[in-house]
Swiss-Prot record:
Enzyme Commission code(s) on record: 5.3.1.16
Pathway terms, separated by semicolons: Amino-acid biosynthesis; L-histidine biosynthesis; L-histidine from 5-phospho-alpha-D-ribose 1-diphosphate: step 4/9
Spans through the membrane: none
The reaction(s) this protein catalyses: 1-(5-phospho-beta-D-ribosyl)-5-[(5-phospho-beta-D-ribosylamino)methylideneamino]imidazole-4-carboxamide = 5-[(5-phospho-1-deoxy-D-ribulos-1-ylimino)methylamino]-1-(5-phospho-beta-D-ribosyl)imidazole-4-carboxamide
Any one GO molecular function term: 1-(5-phosphoribosyl)-5-[(5-phosphoribosylamino)methylideneamino]imidazole-4-carboxamide isomerase activity
Top EC class, one word: isomerase
The keyword Signal is annotated on this UniProt entry: no
Localization in the cell: Cytoplasm
Protein name per the record: 1-(5-phosphoribosyl)-5-[(5-phosphoribosylamino)methylideneamino] imidazole-4-carboxamide isomerase
Covalent S-S links between cysteines: none
Amino acid sequence: MTLKEFIIPAIDIKGGKVVRLYKGEFDKVKVYNENPIDMAKYFEDAGAEHIHVVDLDGALEGLPKNIKILESIVRSVNIPIEFGGGLRSFEAVKAVLDLGVERVVIGSLAYQNPEEFYKIVESFPNKVIVGIDAKDGKVAIKGWTEKTEVSPLEFAKKYDDLDIFGFLFTDVSRDGSMIGANVEATVELAKNLKHPVIASGGVGSLEDVIKLYEKREFGIFGVVVGKAIYEGKIDLKEI
């Protein structure tokens, strides 16, 4: 896997626009682009192998809210899209996969309704990424607004034997901060799981990406990068 393949550029959508939150706080929003579809095309042209799309409105409301935009993104590019945000029912997941999304990220539902989650994984093998959002070493749900008492590893172990694609581990306290990814926690998680782990949160430079890339033998599949690209700290075309 090349370094470029390891990077999964992110498009976070709120109110129909491309935004980034700071540390998962919905009142700390910065708009980077008015058009998510243009952004997706840019990433494809820059050589991205896949794109990570998040419906922030959906994450907050518990139901995908930017479906039309998602559909347009899927139609506009020829690279796989992974999507998360508000996928809290079988119907919502099916609708998104029917649009042509490659993989779905599910977090809150896996925690709150394991039965429904098992049904989804059974129906869509290898299509589900379990989203693990961590705040102060514990899993956070409902768009990061609610903290549980469960550790990321404890949470992940419940699903590691299922036919999932892997896990997405986000350190919410670093998300949008560009202070560097939590390499240690990501490696610790990946080492103890059978399925691959995608890292997310805090990447501020190509050096941060390389630190994770060098640990890929432990089961790290890639890293989601958002703000560092939008702020010009990482240029996909140059990699």
